[in-house]
Amino acid sequence: MFWKFDLHTSSHLDTLLEREDLSLPELLDEEDVLQECKVVNRKLLDFLLQPPHLQAMVAWVTQEPPDSGEERLRYKYPSVACEILTSDVPQINDALGADESLLNRLYGFLQSTGSLNPLLASFFSKVMGILINRKTDQLVSFLRKKDDFVDLLLQHIGTSAIMDLLLRLLTCVERPQLRQDVVNWLNEEKIVQRLIEQIHPSKDENQHSNASQSLCDIIRLSREQMIQVQDSPEPDQLLATLEKQETIEQLLSNMFEGEQSQSVIVSGIQVLLTLLEPRRPRSESVTVNSFFSSVDGQLELLAQGALESTVSSVGALHALRPRLSCFHQLLLEPPKLEPLQMTWGMLAPPLGNTRLHVVKLLASALSANDAALTHELLALDVPNTMLDLFFHYVFNNFLHAQVEGCVSTMLSLGPPPDSSPETPIQNPVVKHLLQQCRLVERILTSWEENDRVQCAGGPRKGYMGHLTRVAGALVQNTEKGPNAEQLRQLLKELPSEQQEQWEAFVSGPLAETNKKNMVDLVNTHHLHSSSDDEDDRLKEFNFPEEAVLQQAFMDFQMQRMTSAFIDHFGFNDEEFGEQEESVNAPFDKTANITFSLNADDENPNANLLEICYKDRIQQFDDDEEEEDEEEAQGSGESDGEDGAWQGSQLARGARLGQPPGVRSGGSTDSEDEEEEDEEEEEDEEGIGCAARGGATPLSYPSPGPQPPGPSWTATFDPVPTDAPTSPRVSGEEELHTGPPAPQGPLSVPQGLPTQSLASPPARDALQLRSQDPTPPSAPQEATEGSKVTEPSAPCQALVSIGDLQATFHGIRSAPSSSDSATRDPSTSVPASGAHQPPQTTEGEKSPEPLGLPQSQSAQALTPPPIPNGSAPEGPASPGSQ
């Protein structure tokens, strides 16, 4: 993408390319020449694609520079030229593939008589590989014209880069038909037979190993190709040639005839092991259901693959059988090796790579379960020899792994395929292991010897882990397996003393060791999958019961944790700003989450719910009481009865811890700040009204439309009761006596003179607030000659809190007879027929209620003279003016 979208910085190559005397070495010295080539710089490509420059780059890649040359000429220029030629630029690929002279110059590199330079060989192989991949037709047709191409490849097969070129020729051809043509061409050139000829004692070790690796890669690639391409027109000719018995016999002859070479034996065994490898099942048999099937089903698929491999490698098995004695002799008489000094002592003679590969080959031959081959191996007593090596080389874990796998396979092998199912015969391999090899006796003796050495302070035997698994395989196949009945019978045939020792060993040391080995070293925490990750297609598979139980427990755990998180991390409105002192406190609470399901445990939120419930009920009670008072006003209650209503308000406020006149309910800091700001504005407006004189009317319509409602309730801000009252602004202070002025919804006492409030409001008039304003259209009743009017707002007189409280105390001390006669003693609510408050006349404007500071209330309002009773001094009501 970096090159595609031209995200590189600008280069000065364009300026350099404008020079007429620019040389190719000078251009290759630039650091960004490769980047500019990959982004298809037109000027640069035009310069590089000139025939002299292309020939020079091919010469750098294929011709070895002089030893006395500069380092740039020997290493830098060939490396940069190879990168440019293999940069996969279409113009360069076309130029190389279309010019046969350049291809001949490249091909000339293989015609060198001596050994090839490994660095130049890698450059040559890389350039040829990109041409095989991009210009397949041109290059294949060019190579097929060369009669000595295969001979030259085999001549330089000792160079790893040439071996890679042969593999590129087999793998980089994408079109199936063209690849089949290449395979047939190489098979006609007898590439397989010629590679086997390279595995000969007369060749060097590099040729042995590279030729063997080439044959192994051909086998694996051909089998892989057969699996991927089901409808191939014809079988792979190279693989068919390799699996022929004649080809394997030629390989075995090179290994054992004449002077034996360890390199030849090891290289030949690698080819034989590749031929005996079990094949993978075909792609059509590997479905989703088989992938999610049980372990037994997967083992059956593997067994089928091994069976197919045995059938397809019949030629190899037949060719191998006459040479088994030669391989067994290698185990008994290994090639001469020098003793090795190990950390635990002297090893003489070492096992060696040759005998290790022989053990691998014989174990693979036993796993093939071929009757003739197995009979020959048992006749040579190969399993017993392998067990001798197992216990002799105490610390060779490579050998221990091979012998353990071989013994476990022999114990679980079924009857040979050619045996009759009606009359199954005894498995000769199992009988050979327990009788000729004395497997049980060897296990018991080695275990006791290891215990004795460890008790003396010596090291533990290196094969003890593998020996434990061999003993476990024997016990498992005795309990369940194709040879279970035969194994139980063979164990019963053991001496009685040995039977008792085996039973004690199985129930004692072996059971304890297996119990220790089954403990998980790391406890894995499975992640819970969300519901979005669930797939209905996976529900049809039967997962193990442990996984189902684990998932159920995790679901239960997540449910409990979710409820705990909600309980601990939630905040009420009042507590949201009061976070815990420690930031980690909510997370510390999660550590205390338990999974207790005790039904008797009380929920910590129960008390909180009860408090919130009572608070809500109390608010509803307040609303109902206010509605009762409003109905009482509409039915004609008196001023004295309003005082009793205010008393109930004071009592309820004391119960709730709130000042009188404030409704029950939570308030926020923002509301308190708004009230303080409005009070400051009212102070300024009240001072302006007082400066103009006391005759200024203080009641006027509210500035906006009022919501509908039958009545309204006045609210007063909390004011200290001992605050002194201020004199009137006009300087005149009238002292009156009479019934006390009521608190709460105030009305002008009956029989007192009233003043019309129809004058328009002043510009700087005081803005009054109302909690429950009454709409202008609400009709009100008038008593004793007053007519019914529809004022725009309810009428309200404003007095100071201190005077009202003093008046209220006067009522408590000297109640009037008329008040007591008209009040219901049980509810303190005015009874029916009581004096109704006077209503406003036509044109009157009723002010909205407002809780003013005490000083402003005293200056603006004075109570009217009351004819009866002796009440304390207080400000006059506006109705008396």
UniProtKB/Swiss-Prot annotation:
<dbReference type="InterPro" id="IPR007587">
    <property type="entry name" value="SAPS"/>
</dbReference>
<dbReference type="GO" id="GO:0031267">
    <property type="term" value="F:small GTPase binding"/>
</dbReference>
<feature type="region of interest" description="Interaction with PPP6C">
    <location>
        <begin position="10"/>
        <end position="403"/>
    </location>
</feature>
<feature type="modified residue" description="Phosphoserine">
    <location>
        <position position="702"/>
    </location>
</feature>
<protein>
    <recommendedName>
        <fullName>Serine/threonine-protein phosphatase 6 regulatory subunit 1</fullName>
    </recommendedName>
</protein>
<dbReference type="Pfam" id="PF04499">
    <property type="entry name" value="SAPS"/>
</dbReference>
<dbReference type="GO" id="GO:0019903">
    <property type="term" value="F:protein phosphatase binding"/>
</dbReference>
<dbReference type="GO" id="GO:0019888">
    <property type="term" value="F:protein phosphatase regulator activity"/>
</dbReference>
<keyword id="KW-0963">Cytoplasm</keyword>
<dbReference type="GO" id="GO:0009966">
    <property type="term" value="P:regulation of signal transduction"/>
</dbReference>
<feature type="compositionally biased region" description="Acidic residues">
    <location>
        <begin position="621"/>
        <end position="642"/>
    </location>
</feature>
<feature type="modified residue" description="Phosphothreonine">
    <location>
        <position position="524"/>
    </location>
</feature>
<feature type="modified residue" description="Phosphoserine">
    <location>
        <position position="635"/>
    </location>
</feature>
<feature type="modified residue" description="Phosphoserine">
    <location>
        <position position="638"/>
    </location>
</feature>
<feature type="modified residue" description="Phosphoserine">
    <location>
        <position position="759"/>
    </location>
</feature>
<feature type="modified residue" description="Phosphoserine">
    <location>
        <position position="530"/>
    </location>
</feature>
<dbReference type="GO" id="GO:0005829">
    <property type="term" value="C:cytosol"/>
</dbReference>
<feature type="modified residue" description="Phosphoserine">
    <location>
        <position position="846"/>
    </location>
</feature>
<feature type="compositionally biased region" description="Polar residues">
    <location>
        <begin position="814"/>
        <end position="830"/>
    </location>
</feature>
<comment type="subunit">
    <text>Protein phosphatase 6 (PP6) holoenzyme is proposed to be a heterotrimeric complex formed of the catalytic subunit, a SAPS domain-containing subunit (PP6R) and an ankyrin repeat-domain containing regulatory subunit (ARS). Interacts with PPP6C and NFKBIE. Interacts with ANKRD28, ANKRD44 and ANKRD52.</text>
</comment>
<feature type="compositionally biased region" description="Pro residues">
    <location>
        <begin position="700"/>
        <end position="710"/>
    </location>
</feature>
<feature type="modified residue" description="Phosphoserine">
    <location>
        <position position="232"/>
    </location>
</feature>
<feature type="modified residue" description="Phosphoserine">
    <location>
        <position position="529"/>
    </location>
</feature>
<keyword id="KW-0597">Phosphoprotein</keyword>
<comment type="similarity">
    <text>Belongs to the SAPS family.</text>
</comment>
<dbReference type="GO" id="GO:0005634">
    <property type="term" value="C:nucleus"/>
</dbReference>
<dbReference type="InterPro" id="IPR016024">
    <property type="entry name" value="ARM-type_fold"/>
</dbReference>
<feature type="region of interest" description="Disordered">
    <location>
        <begin position="621"/>
        <end position="881"/>
    </location>
</feature>
<comment type="function">
    <text>Regulatory subunit of protein phosphatase 6 (PP6). May function as a scaffolding PP6 subunit. Involved in the PP6-mediated dephosphorylation of NFKBIE opposing its degradation in response to TNF-alpha.</text>
</comment>
<feature type="modified residue" description="Phosphoserine">
    <location>
        <position position="726"/>
    </location>
</feature>
<feature type="compositionally biased region" description="Acidic residues">
    <location>
        <begin position="669"/>
        <end position="686"/>
    </location>
</feature>
<feature type="modified residue" description="Phosphoserine">
    <location>
        <position position="531"/>
    </location>
</feature>
